[in-house]
Amino acid sequence: MKKLKFLLYPISVLYSIYSSFRNLLFDFGLIHSIEYKIPTIGIGNLSTGGTGKSIIVDYLIEKFKKNKKITTLSRGYNRKTKGFVHASKSSDAYEIGDEPFQFFSKHPEINVVVCEDRRKGMNIILKNLSDTELCIW
């Protein structure tokens, strides 16, 4: 365990420096967060797998789908397509990714979309799926 700590310590220092620098860019207004016209819920670190995000997304869908028109937005990890894809009855895991396919199969009444560029995906949702009341990503 000591060897692992020794090996990971330099990585943690680099990550800390990166995070601090990025936070400074936000503080000085050089980069900005984006506000959308609809509520959004972002779950965890979108680039790290195996952290339980899908379970939380599924829980939130169950909790809100009776009262809100929900759209989920995912990058569609491991899918064979590119760009924005709106899940349909003919969609499969190759087209939209395994987790979005799981959400669509379990909750066909919600919109499930994938787009590797989250900002682009949200802009398309706002334009083409204007009945969306809550977006979970």
Where do the protein language model's features map onto the residues?
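A transmembrane-helix-recognition feature enriched in membrane-embedded lipid enzymes
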Residues: 1-39
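ATP-dependent carboxylate-amine ligase catalytic core
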Residues: 4-7, 11, 48, 65-137
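N-terminal, well-ordered alpha-helical segments
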Residues: 12, 19, 41, 58-62, ...
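Residue-level signal for inorganic ion chemistry
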Residues: 14, 54, 103
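Walker A (P-loop) phosphate-binding motif
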Residues: 24-89
